Every structure is written in structure tokens, then in C-alpha cells.
Amino acid sequence: MKKLVSIVLCCVMSLMLVSFMAACGQKGDELVIWTFTDELQTMVNDYYSKDNPDVAVDVKVYEVNSLDTLVTNSMLSGKNLPDVLAIEEKFLRKYIEDDIFEPLEGLSDKSANMYDYTINAAKNSEGKQVAYAWQATPGAFFYRTDMAKELLGIESLEQMEEKLGSWQENSWEKFVDLAAELRRESAAGQNAQFEDVRILSAVNEISIPFYSARESGWAVENSAGEKVLTIDPSLYQGDYSMLDVYKRLQIGDGTYGSGQKPYVNEQTYRQQGWFSDMSGDKVFGYLLSSYSLHYDLKANAKSVATGNDTSGKWGVCKAPVAYSDGGTWLAVLNTSDKKEEAQKLIEYFTMNEDFLTKWANDTGDFINNKKIMNAFAADPERSEPFLGGQNHYALFAEIAEELNGNNLTVYDAILNDNFTTWAINYGRFDQVGNEEGSALVNALDSFVTSAQTSFRDSLVTNDPPYTLS
């Protein structure tokens, strides 16, 4: 087994989990699945078990970070691991490079209709496929169509994408310009219906599109075979880099270092205020993936407290860049004594077109099958009332074709969060100083220090690992 990059981070947690892990082992002849999403419980109970009544399956659901800690500690002991593991995107490469998965042989023909990025992201160092995903998770910009009409005079998807500059070279510049226009048009006394509208609820919604669309991930291999910390220029270099957009959105109509009037609502990403904004009239849009339509927007469109309901007032269009967010891959552990049965279960969930079609129809999930999704996209009768009758499958199918999945690394779970923290600090001139040039260097250096602390044994750092123009 290869050296685990996460050993140092999890050694303390291992002592806390020893007694708990002893109770988590496999039971008899059951196939054991560990997952962070309760979707798999439904998929097993309502679909797989009905089609495969002779196969007993035990699904154990954990919070995503707790699952990562549990898996890491089980890997250290080599015991108590499940047969099948559901992996969230940010942990995918870590587990693959830890070499704990069995290659999934003989399925390449059946996976031909999957989106390329889901395949590319889940190959081991020998180029063998070790995990498959049942869903694809293209990201887009969900926006309020009533606000677009009232504040911007926009009545069509095409007009919205032109205003955003979607997939154009200057797309983030147009995004910031739109944020400023929304603020102007909704200023006090300007509009009777919508006042003080912000383009986003939380500024760090922009992180995922930047991370997904960058050319290089957090590490590249040098001639000596070492992993070298890499900060893609799109994250920090020049106008409308990720750090620069953070600054512009958080400064808003103010001045750097002397008071800010942000273009965002300054909520905390995926906390209560962020969800509450989905039912209010203060936020214009959200950068979300396909699954968030059903699990986030629909679930929070009606406020219990105020009675306000934004259902039917949303549309979805291309974001400034093509990106993906999250997703779930399934893999067979190489410690399993039920590898054949486990692979058949994964084949059912990711390649059985009857199941995938039913699942997509029943849940609205955007599934990892081009043939089925293209049929949904072309169906004139298929529309989403929540999106004012829009057929969102056509848009998601187009976005998913643009993704490649080649920039994921073992470091993503920690370094994505760390860089986002310093991007926020830089945009608010918090802990970095309020002189623009030195603040940028301080933010980058602070991030580099955090990376060195987290991965001192597995990540080489040049001095410095960035180039300022």
C-alpha cells in the first residue's frame, strides 16, 4: 500500500475511532456499503433489492468528513473496510492514490455513454478504471427571472448568458459588471419591488468554478517524481483572477482598505442564511451544480417564517466558465471478499439503463449517461415548473461535455478550503493588511505555509510557488 498522505492529519482521530470502528465491520454474507449520501439507501431499498432479491446489502451512512476519517483509520489497520465505498469528489484522488480500490474490469464497453470527465477522474496510476459515477454534476448559474426582467430588462436565457459573458474570455469581468449593475438598479428609491439586490448570497460560491476550470491542480510531478505545489495563475494572477474577483465582489462600491459596500450578501456558504436567501428577494443568483436544483433550491424556495415562495421564478444558464461541483463515485475495496458481487452492484447503479432512466425520472438527477440525457434534452414535453418550464437537461448536457476531470489531486479536500479562506481574507483585507500589493503576497504566503504544514511529507514547495507580474 502506498504512503497515505492523510496519516499525519488523522492520527489523533484514530484513537477516538478505534472502539467505534470495531462495530463497523462486515456482517455475514451482506454486501456492505459505506456512503456519505443517503441516496444510496433509497437506491438499494427501492430499486436494487427489488431487482436482486437474493443479494443482501447493508448501507451505512456517515457525514462526509467523518466517513473520510473512518476510512483512513480502517486503511491503517487493514481491517473493517466495506465492500463498496461511495466517494465524494474532493476525496476521490486521495483514495485512488492510496491504492485501496480493485480495478473494475470488463466494463469499458458499458461505460461508453458516460461523460468523459467522470471517467478521467477515476483512473489509477496504471490507467485502470477503479470507480464509476451514476451521476454527472455540471455547474451553472441559477438566477431569478423576475429580477432579471424587472432590473435588467432581460427576458430570455440567451440574453442572460450574453449579459454574463458565459464562457467568453472576459466572463468574470462581465460577472462583476453585472453585480455592479444589479446594485445600482436596486438602490434605494430605484425600484419598488426589489431593493439592494446582491448577485450572490456567499462570495465563496465562485471558488468551485475557478478550481474546476483551472488548467493545473494543486500539484505537478517533477523529474525526480516529487509532487510540487502548484498555484494555477487563474487563481491569483492579474485582473479577474479568483483572488481579484473575490476582492471586487467584497469591496463592491467601496474602496480597498477604507470601507466596503459588497456586491454579495456576505452569508456563509451552505449555512442557514445562505439557504434562507433562496426564498427571499435580496439575492439574484447562485452558482450551483445540477443536483442542487432539487436538493437545495427547491427545498428552500418557500420560507416557513415569511411565507414567501420563489418557486417558478428561477432560470438556469451557463456560468462564466464550464465547471462541475461534487458528485459520487462507487468503488470496490481491494480487501473485499465479495469483489465480484460488489462490481455487479456498481454496474447496476452506474450502467443499467433501466435503473438510470427510472432514477432520473423519479428524482430529477442528471445521470452519467449521454444517451439518456440527450433523449431527455430533446424531449419537447420535458420541462421543469420550478424553472418556469425550462428544460434544464439540454443545458446540463452541453456543460457536461466540456468537462475533463484532469485537475483533481489528493490535496483538494484541504487546499481548496485553505485557499478559499485566504481569498476571503484578501478580499476583506483581513489578516493580510490593507495595502493592495502586500496584501496579495501575504495571502499567497499564508496559503503556502498552510499547505506546507498540512503536507510537509508529501508535497515539495518551490520558493515561492507563484509568479507575480
Model segments located where?
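Positively charged n-region of N-terminal signal peptides that target proteins for export
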Residues: 1-7
